[in-house]
Each structure stands twice: as C-alpha cells, then as structure tokens.
Swiss-Prot record:
Residues 21-299 form the ABC transmembrane type-1 domain. PROSITE patterns: ABC_TM1F (PS50929), ABC_TRANSPORTER_1 (PS00211), ABC_TRANSPORTER_2 (PS50893). It is an enzyme of class 7 (translocase). In IrtB the ATP-binding domain (NBD) and the transmembrane domain (TMD) are fused. The IrtAB transporter assumes an inward-facing conformation, which may represent the low-affinity state after mycobactin release towards the SID and the cytoplasm. GO terms for cellular component: plasma membrane. It comes from Mycolicibacterium thermoresistibile (strain ATCC 19527 / DSM 44167 / CIP 105390 / JCM 6362 / NCTC 10409 / 316). Keywords: ATP-binding, Cell inner membrane, Cell membrane, Membrane, Nucleotide-binding, Translocase, Transmembrane, Transmembrane helix, Transport. This is Mycobactin import ATP-binding/permease protein IrtB.
Amino acid sequence: MIRTLLRLVPAEKRGAVAGYAVLTLLSVLLRAVGAVLLIPLLAALFSDTPSDAWLWLGWLTAVTLAGWVTDTNTARLGFDLGFAVLSRTQHDMADRLPNVAMSWFTPDNTATARQAIAATGPELAGLVVNLLTPLIGAALLPAAIGVALLFVSVPLGLAALAGVAVLFGALALSGRLSRAADKVAGETNSAFTERIIEFARTQQALRAARRVEPARSQVGSALAAQHGAGLRLLTMQIPGQVLFSLAGQVALIGFAGMAVWLTVRGQLGVPEAIALIVVLVRYLEPFAAIADLAPALETTRATLNRIQAVLDAPTLPAGRRRLDRTGAAPSIEFDDVRFSYGDEVVLDGVSFTLRPGNTTAIVGPSGSGKTTILSLIAGLQQPASGRVLLDGVDVTTLDPEARRAAVSVVFQHPYLFDGTLRDNVLVGDPEADPDDVTAAMRLARVDELLDRLPDGDATVVGEGGTALSGGERQRVSIARALLKPAPVLLVDEATSALDNANEAAVVDALTADPRPRTRVIVAHRLASIRHADRVLFVEAGRVVEDGAIDELLAAGGRFAQFWAQQQAASEWAIGSTAR
C-alpha cells in the first residue's frame, strides 16, 4: 500500500515525504522515551531523595512538549501531502481516462474506474494523517519501547522485542487469511453495484417482461454471490482475530512475567515495577490500534489498487503531429488494415481511399465490421496491423487533441448530459458563436422541438436525455456534431431506430451541412444513404464492393441483393399476403 501511495506523490513533493518520515520517526522515539522515563521518575520519587524526581519530571516535560511540536508539524505536512496526492490523482485520472484504449473498458474495469473516481475525495486527502501516521506510529512504537527498555534492563527489553515479533507475526498471518476473501468480497460488491445500476436503468424492459422482482433477475444472483463472499470473509477474519488476541495475551504474559521475575530476584525495584505497568499499557496500545485500523487498511489498499489500475490502464498510441490543412476536409485511407476483438477477426486486410469532401456510405450485414471502421477513423481503436491515414498522416502519430479535434461523431445511441438542451449542443464547441449554435440547431431541426418544450433550449433534458424521445435525442446529438468544427463527420446508424419523420430530419441535416467535411455514414436503412457519393459494401471483414449507388445496383451483386431485401422489408405490413 505504501509503495502505491508513494507512486501517487507528485515529484515536487518527494522531498516532503522524507521530511514526513523523519518527523514520524522522531514522534515515535519521543513517545517511547516518554513512556520509559516513567521508570526512573518513579524510582526517584520513592527513593531516599525524592527531590531527584524533579530532574526526571523536567526531562519528561521536555520530551512531551517536543512530541506535541513534532506531532503538530507531522500533521501539517501529512495534510499537505494528502492534498498533493488528491490533486495529482484527480488530474492524472482525468487525463488518463480519455486516452485509455476502449478495449480496456470491460464491465469489471468500468466498475473499477467508477469506484476509483468516487474514492478521489476527502478520504484520500486525509489518508496520510488519518491512517498512515497512526499506522506507522502503532507499528514502530512497541519496537521503540523495547529498544528503550534495553537501557533499563536487557532481559526486559528482549522480552518486549520478542512480544513485538509474536504480535506482528500474528497480524501478518491474520491479514493473509482474510486478504484473499476480502478480494473476492470486493469483486462481488462491485458486481452487485453494477447489477443494481443496471436493474434501475432497465425497469421498463423488466416490468414488461414481468421480472421486476430482484430475486428473478441478475440482481438476485449478484446479491447471493455478495452474501456468500461476505460470509467467507467473516469466516476467514474470525480465526485471524482470535490468533491476534492470543498473541497479545502471550506478549502480555511474557512482558509481565519478565518484570515479576526481575523484581523477585531483586534486579528491579518495586517503584520500577509499578512504572512498568504504565509502560506495558503504552506497549500494548499500538497493537489494539493496528487491529482497529485493519479494516480501514484493507479498504484503503483496495482503493489505491483501483486507482493504480486506472492509471496503469493501456492507452492509445499518441504522437505529436497535426494535420497540415487544419479545417480542410481531409482524405481518409485504410492501408491493409486488420483488427480483432480477442480471437475474433473483424477486419481482414481492408484497403480503400476516400476523397476529401465526399460522402461515403458503408453498408453491410450486422457484424461485418462497419462500426469498427468508424472507430478506427475516430482513433477510438487502433489496428492490429496496417495503417489508417488522414491526409496521409497516420492516425496513431497524431497528437491526441488534434485527433479528437479532427473528428465529429454521431452515435447510434446518443448520450445527453444532465443539463439544458443548449448545454448539450454546446458540448460540440463550448466557445461557439450564438449564431452558429442557432444554425446547427436549425440544420438538425432541433428548433422544431423548442416550442413543445417547457423552457425552450433551456429545458433540462435529464441524465441520458430521458426528458426527450429517442428521435429528439438524436436530433440534439446531430446538432452537437454539426456544431463541432471538425473536418471529418462520422455517422453510425443514426437513423436505425427512428420513424420516417425523424429519419428525414437527420438525413436532411447531414446533407445540408455547409461546412467542408469528409463524411462517412454507416447505415442499414438505405434511405439514409441516398445522397452518398460512394458506397463500400462490407462483408465478413472485407470490402467486397465499391462504387456509386447506381453502379452497384446495375452490377447486381451483394449490394443490389441487400437493397432488394431492404425494399421488401420496407413494404411489409401486418396483413400482407405471402407470395
């Protein structure tokens, strides 16, 4: 855990870490010395010259004051380090996530990222002071007391150090017993959280399927798994706690027994023996503190591991190049591109060149690789081999900001943020001129929606755009994409779930866009591609036909068959007679 935490400390604060370590060690030594000073203090107080106790009291007072000053400075430095870790972690995760390879975002990793982001709050800022400082103090103080006791009585000091070894051995063993179960419990907790979120978001479908009872859904399975993991965790923790408690009793008996033996033999006076009772309490207190900190320690270790997992997530290749013709519609070239999802080959040697400013439609059956082509152009994925070029520049060598600025995307399932309709359009270009925003909304026919909405473009659309219909959300996403001054526009199945009116609105918006762009449209419904200059028909990861719509229809190949199937499907209606 400490190694992970040190990796999160900013470079400019590494010197402060050394200062913090020195102050923490000094604090431990001062507390150990203060505890052991009670022995000569009481010995002097019960001696023939009790006035000698003033000297030892003075030393005890000085050590106590020095400890207060040290602890105050340690706390200040600890908070400074904690806030530095918090700030760096927040910035690093914010910088990392937009560049992480999309293949990393599995359900488990997505849950890890969500929990890591949620953890970057006040608890991370207070980690050093509230957990690390007490933990280091509790771990070192018994050993420091044992070393200090060597100067009073070597056998007593050795007994104390032996007790430290026994207690830390028991603590390590109990931690090992529970760590594996704790990992499983953490995984099942994450899975249960994801299922609860899924259960809440899919209520409409679940109610329609009469599966609203959690026990009949995957929530029930996740809950059962969480319950079982929790029981296993408790089962593994109890033996560890018993073992640690027994070790504490052994250390107590060993230390107290040594003190009694030395007193009986006359090697230790009665006043010193009485003082040792107080020292014994100070000796055992840290172990109780460690036991109390153990759950927080495991939780913090898991949190830091999640944060580190996000920061270690694989990122897309990034270069420093930029497009030479900024703002001009670029050419797009695929040069023998291959891509796979695991063992499944999606694109197998795809090559083509799209002319600047043209509109190209990519058509083909489901699973043929159409959306993957768009992802590669957008830089969301990287080819396993081959190259994707914009104006002759390999996408992988582009600066990440230049790559993102070059492409605007309309997704099949658009996501709107919990803000106003206008705010969601402005995501495309937050600094856009108001006239440009109005023009983009007019092109996407968002202006037709404003009269029906309670607050016009100031209407709050809700998380995910739940206040709008699917077609309305798609229009807003089109306006957002058109507002972005990107020279490449990618459209992925934007009309697949829309009615005829909304489909016409989307197609008209894409056609009427006056900005010079190279457009690539993926579509199943062929009405969406009627204005395309060129069609690529993709099947089984290969481009099997390439040409203008009329040429491909006349050729009578796969595109013509696909077109005929679409035409037949569009004419089907309930009550149609089979021929």
